[in-house]
Structures are given as structure tokens and as C-alpha cells.
């Protein structure tokens, strides 16, 4: 059985549809940075997804070639995720999608080193004849957060976010979105193949203890 991060780390990928507090450890990701409306067919966000998966599957299938990764085991590619922010906005304003900045990411298994990642970028560039220069090895220590499973349209997330913020406040926390701590979404459904009303998205916000 291939290792499935969603099943093995349910506390990060499969929270309930009610808010909870979680401490997220440092993880490494394949990442692409960009800006603009994520719904634009020819925009930077849609392009980033193809780049991420190009590297993700090059690493996943590496065991079939000459590049052997130390400690490799078969695994399911983790879900697509995104860190989002807007300049001059506290939190997220869903009515101003064209002002989004993002870091689009896919988690890397812990056994993948920076050297393995660099090999994958070179290999994917050679095989796919595509420019992967925007792809980066991104380490991020997210820390303490409030999160919730959001079911439905992305545009309806504000109701879930409000519930999360209320929960955090009731438990002695305050939201801590900053220049280095972001609105975070983990996409468990493919919007091309799933009814909008059934889309599953983990929504996560950084928090810190309230100073009394």
C-alpha cells in the first residue's frame, strides 16, 4: 500500500467541519509564487499547478529511473495547497480576487532533499521541454493554527472563517495573519470533477495566544 499523507496525518488533512486548534510542524514543499485571480484560465495560478505536478510526479516516479532517493518509499502525491494574501488587507477579501498573491504548494516527503529536488527540476525540464525555473524548494514552519473543513464553494468560505475566528477567541487566541503567516487552503476535491456544493477544502489560519 502506498503511503497516503491524508490518511496518516488526518489531523492536518481531514479535520472535522467544526473548528479545532492544531500545531503544524515544519514541512518542505514544492512551491510556485504568483499573483492574480485564481479563476483566470491563462493566469499565473493555473500555470503554477501544472508546474507543481510536473515536479511532484517526477519525484514520485524516480524509483523507476537511475536517480535513487535515499529512504524512498511509495506514496500518494499529497493534495494541492495554497497560501494566500492581499496587500493592505487584513485576512482575505473574496471580492478582490485579482489582488491575490499566492504560494501554491505540494508537500514533499521528508526523504526528499534539496539535491533530490534540484535533480527533479532538471529532469522534468529535460523530459517535458518545459521551463520549471519558477519552482522552488520551500520550507515552512506554520506553527499554531485554527482550522476547519469547509464544504462547498470557495466563495462561501467567509462563514467558515468567521466560525474559526470565534472559536479561536473563545479559547484564548487571536488570529495572527502577518507578512509571513498566511490564509491557508488545502484542496481535497478537484473542482473540475466535483459538484461545487461538495467541494472539500481545509481552511487554516495562524493564531497566537492573547496577551491578557
Describe the role of every protein-language-model region.
Residues 1-212:
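A solvent-exposed interaction/effector surface
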Amino acid at each position: 500500500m502506498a503511503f497516503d499523507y491524508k490518511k496518516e496525518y488526518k489531523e492536518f488533512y481531514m479535520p472535522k467541519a467544526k473548528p479545532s486548534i492544531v500545531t503544524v510542524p515544519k514541512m518542505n514543499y514544492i512551491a510556485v509564487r504568483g499573483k492574480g485571480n485564481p479563476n483566470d484560465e491563462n493566469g499565473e495560478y493555473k500555470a503554477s499547478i501544472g508546474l507543481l505536478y510536473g515536479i511532484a510526479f517526477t519525484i514520485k516516479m524516480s524509483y523507476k529511473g537511475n536517480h535513487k532517493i535515499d529512504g524512498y518509499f511509495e506514496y500518494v502525491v499529497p493534495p494541492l495547497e495554497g497560501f494566500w494574501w492581499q496587500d493592505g488587507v487584513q485576512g482575505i477579501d473574496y471580492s478582490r480576487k485579482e489582488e491575490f498573491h499566492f504560494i501554491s504548494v505540494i508537500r514533499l516527503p521528508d526523504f526528499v532533499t534539496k539535491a533530490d529536488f534540484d535533480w527533479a527540476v532538471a529532469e522534468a525540464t529535460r523530459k517535458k521541454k518545459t521551463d520549471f525555473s519558477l519552482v522552488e524548494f520551500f520550507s515552512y514552519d506554520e506553527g499554531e493554527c485554527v482550522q476547519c473543513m469547509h464544504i462547498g464553494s470557495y466563495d462561501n468560505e467567509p462563514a467558515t472563517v468567521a466560525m474559526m475566528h470565534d472559536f479561536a477567541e473563545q479559547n484564548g487566541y487571536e488570529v495572527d495573519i502577518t507578512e509571513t503567516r498566511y490564509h491557508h487552503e488545502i484542496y481535497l476535491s478537484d473542482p473540475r470533477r466535483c459538484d461545487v456544493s461538495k467541494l472539500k477544502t481545509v481552511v487554516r489560519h495562524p493564531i497566537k495566544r492573547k496577551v491578557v
